[in-house]
Amino acid sequence: MKRRLCLAALAAAVAAPASRAEALSGLARVRQRGSLVVGLYHDMPPFHVKGEGIDVQLARALAAQLEVGVSLLPFHADESVADDLRHVVWRGHYLGWGPADVLMHVPVERALMDANPRVRVLAPYYREKVAIARRLDALPVLDSLAALRGRPVAVAGQSLAGWLLIGADGGALRDTLLTHWPDGVAAARALRQGEVVAAAGLASELESVLGADARFAIEPLPAPRAPSEGWAIGCAVKKDAVDLAEALQRAMQSLQGSGQLAAMFQSAGVPWRL
C-alpha cells in the first residue's frame, strides 16, 4: 500500500510540471521557453532553402519582436495543407516532431480556415500570383497562351502553373512544355540560360531570378483559370493561442510599418506586395 502511494506521489510530481506547462497560454509558453518555434517548408525558394530565404528572415524578425530567440522547424510538405497544419501546428507528426508555435507561408483563405477549425490563420504578409516570364526578343507581346504554341516553355509539372498550362486550350501546349523542373526558380534559370522562350511559376520564383534583368518581362499568366488577384499568405497558430496570435499580428504590423518586411523581399529580388 505504502509503495503504491509513493509511486502515485512520484507520478503526480512528474506530471505536475507538464500540467502547468499545458496550462500556460501560447505566448507564455514561448516566453518561458525563451524561443519561438517556427515551422518552415523545405525547398521553397525564395522563401526557404537550406536555412536561408525570406521566411527565415521573417521568422527571426518576428521572434526579435517578441524578444525571444528563434528555433526553426523545417519540414517537407505533405499531401495537403490540412496535413501540414495538423503535423506542424495543432498536433505534431506521428514520427514525434512538432508541433511548432507558428507555421509560415499559409494561404489566408476562408475555405481553408473553415475546414481547419483547430488553427488560427493570421498576419498576411505577401500576395502571391501565378505568373509567366518571357524573353522580350522572342515574345514581345503575350496577350494569350496561343502565342506559346510550338514554343518551348519551362514549368514545374507538379505546380499550379504546370497544371494550368498542361490543361490550357485543350492540351494544345503539351508537346512543347518542359515540365521536369522542380520549381519555378529552376524554370526561370532555364529561361535565363536561353533553353526556352518562356517560363511559368509563382511570381516570387520568377522575380527572384529574372526581376532585375531587362531582357525579360514577368506578367500574370493569361490563363482563364488562374486566380486573377492571387492569394495572400500568412501564418498559422493553434486556435486557442489567442495571445500568441495577437502578439504575432502586432509584430507583423510593426515590421510592415517600419519597412523591414519590404526590405526582406527586396533582398531576394522580389517586390513586396499585399
Locate predicted features.
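Periplasmic-binding protein-like
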Residues: 41-42, 126-131, 210-252, 269-274
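Acidic, polar ligand-binding/catalytic clefts
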Residues: 73-146
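Extended ligand-binding regions for polar small-molecule ligands
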Residues: 56-65, 136-139, 146, 151-152, ...
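N-terminal export signals
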Residues: 5-21
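Beta->alpha turn/N-cap motifs
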Residues: 39-44, 73-77, 92-110, 159, ...
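A ligand-binding cleft/hinge motif common to bilobed small-molecule-binding domains
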Residues: 83, 102-115, 164-167, 192-229
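Extracytoplasmic small-molecule ligand-binding "clamshell" domains
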Residues: 24-101
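Bilobed "Venus flytrap"/periplasmic-binding protein-like clamshell domains
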Residues: 37, 51-64, 129-182
